[in-house]
């Protein structure tokens, strides 16, 4: 977080694009402000190329005037039904909208829009940190307008609504997901009144499309520490509406003095462990869902206590219906998550026993190109507080990885290194080390790699004799 004076803001905005916007607005006699995320990110020192501009008047007029100043290389898109316009120039995108005030019907998040002032426009913003505005008109260039002390909230690391949070969330329930997302992405706390309003209005999320919710879920998942967001979602009741199956993991049962671990907390640990290793969105989803089958497979055994046999298989079968309901992709991404969930116990079983070639080869066959991601998930799944037991598994996983690498090399040689080698060619044609031997050896290798000849002795020998004849080694 960086505290910026108006003079410092003016210096940061001392770029051609902002001066051209300023000139365009001044020529039309209209107030013009850069607003929202771009301003927020200036204070947070985060890069941003997407610029939102509010005009007190017609945003389309200012956008058109800017296009004229930028010339042919700029592209103008006008959306008259929404009163907005977009100008694209090189790697910069500027969105223009007229200042407006909004009101909502209870059963819709589509607002009733009227022309308004800058104050009206800032009142309708979702959070104080997104309600910041900086004037671009030449006489006030760089002047910050911050009626809700959003800069202080940025400094304190707080997400809060500008006005009554119950009205903010009831009017547009997607803002509840955005609230959790911003808190997670920025590692901020949610202000107390705002947090309580999330719980009170959670049921309003039902009017939001699955696609919009899925988009916010993916943004939370790609945050540095997504578990923070999932605890917010669970504790406010939002997660119960989105993924009730995940909430089931939070239940701990005790019988005969024996309890099982809290599988929700364990899942959050696994998710964080995976996030430390990769930004792969779908591997993160696999981490989130790897134990999703445990509640449905939980059984009590008088000897063993609580068991979750085949929870990986049960969980894998749940994935398609969950993805379909949440409007997540029903394609190779879903199958990837399903595969990792189903296979995530296999390396653990292998590592707990003798690490044999056959067991690892079967694992390689089933996991295919996703073997490294599977191993990352399995290593993340070791969350035992018993450090000796944890180290035992991690050491064995290292052996499994070494065996996988060794088998890949050996199997490659077995599959693609011709079964007739250079030494045999030399003996067959009574040759020493010479270019002809190298040429014949390369011919056989190319034929195998190109799939023209099976890596079997008889077809390779036939090809060898044909090429030897061409080289004059036999008649």
Residue locations for each model-derived region?
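Catalytic cores of the polymerase beta-like nucleotidyltransferase superfamily
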Residues: 1-475
